[in-house]
C-alpha cells in the first residue's frame, strides 16, 4: 500500500494511518472485513477508500464503489482514476445515464475482469451485473442505501470485504446497536489541506 500512499498529493493524518492499519489487518484476515468508517465531510474517507481499493486490486480482486448519486459517482470516479491510473488500475463509471452500447461494453469488461474498479450508483445493483472476482465493496453515504440494497451488491462476490462510509455522526453506542455486525473506525482529526 505504500506505493499508492506515497503518490497521494498530501500526507495522511495519524487518524487516516490508524484506520488504514485497521483495514489492512481486516483485509489480511481469514474473516471478511465488515467495517464502518465514519468521518466528517472532508476528513479523508475517500483517500482511505482509494488505498483500500489499491490493496484489493493488487491482491487480484475487483472493487465496487457504490454511491447514491451520479454527481458523487462522477466525483469519486475522477478521484480514483487520477490516483490509480499510474498503477495500471482500470477504473470505470456506471450510472443510470450510461449509454446502452457503452454500458454493454463495461458489463462485459467487468465480467471478464478487465475493469478493476467500478464506481456507480444503484445501477450496480442490476441483476445483469456480474463480476469476475469481486473482493471489496465500498458503500459511500451508506445511510442512503437499505440493508437489502447493500446485500445485493455484496452478494455479487464470494464473501467480499465490506467498507461502508458515512459522514453522518453516529454516536458509538447507537452505531453498535445499528451496525453491531460492523467494526467501527471513526476519523477523529481533520485532514490537513495543502
Pin down the residues of each PLM region:
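Conserved motor-coupling elements within RecA-like helicase/translocase cores
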Residues: 97-118, 128-134
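P-loop (Walker A) phosphate-binding loop of NTP-binding proteins
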Residues: 40, 68, 167
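Post-Walker A helix-loop "phosphate-sensing" segment adjacent to the P-loop in P-loop NTPases
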Residues: 56-64, 85-86, 160, 183-186
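Walker B catalytic acidic pair
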Residues: 121-122, 140-141
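Conserved helix-turn-beta segment of the N-terminal RecA-like "Helicase ATP-binding" lobe
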Residues: 72-109
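Glycine-centered short loops/turns at secondary-structure junctions
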Residues: 60-61, 88, 113, 194
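Post-DEXD/H (motif II) to motif III coupling segment of the RecA-like Helicase ATP-binding lobe
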Residues: 131-136, 142-192
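Pre-Walker A segment
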Residues: 1-64
Amino acid at each position: 500500500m505504500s506505493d499508492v500512499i506515497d503518490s497521494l498529493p498530501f500526507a495522511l493524518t495519524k487518524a487516516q494511518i490508524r484506520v488504514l492499519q485497521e483495514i489492512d489487518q481486516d483485509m489480511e484476515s481469514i474473516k471478511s472485513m465488515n467495517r464502518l468508517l465514519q468521518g466528517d465531510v472532508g476528513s479523508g474517507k475517500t483517500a482511505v477508500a482509494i488505498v483500500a481499493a489499491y490493496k484489493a486490486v493488487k491482491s487480484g480482486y475487483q472493487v465496487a464503489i457504490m454511491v447514491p448519486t451520479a454527481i458523487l459517482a462522477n466525483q469519486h470516479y475522477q478521484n480514483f482514476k487520477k490516483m490509480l491510473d499510474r498503477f495500471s488500475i482500470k477504473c470505470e463509471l456506471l450510472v443510470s445515464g450510461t449509454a446502452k452500447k457503452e454500458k454493454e461494453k463495461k458489463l462485459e469488461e467487468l465480467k471478464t475482469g478487465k475493469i478493476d474498479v467500478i464506481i456507480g450508483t444503484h445501477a450496480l445493483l442490476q441483476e445483469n451485473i456480474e463480476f469476475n472476482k469481486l473482493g471489496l465493496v465500498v458503500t459511500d453515504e451508506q445511510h442512503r442505501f437499505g440493508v437489502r440494497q447493500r446485500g445485493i451488491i455484496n452478494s455479487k462476490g464470494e464473501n467480499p470485504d465490506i467498507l461502508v462510509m458515512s459522514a453522518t455522526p453516529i454516536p458509538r453506542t447507537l452505531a453498535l446497536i445499528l451496525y453491531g455486525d460492523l467494526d467501527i473506525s471513526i476519523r477523529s482529526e481533520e485532514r490537513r489541506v495543502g
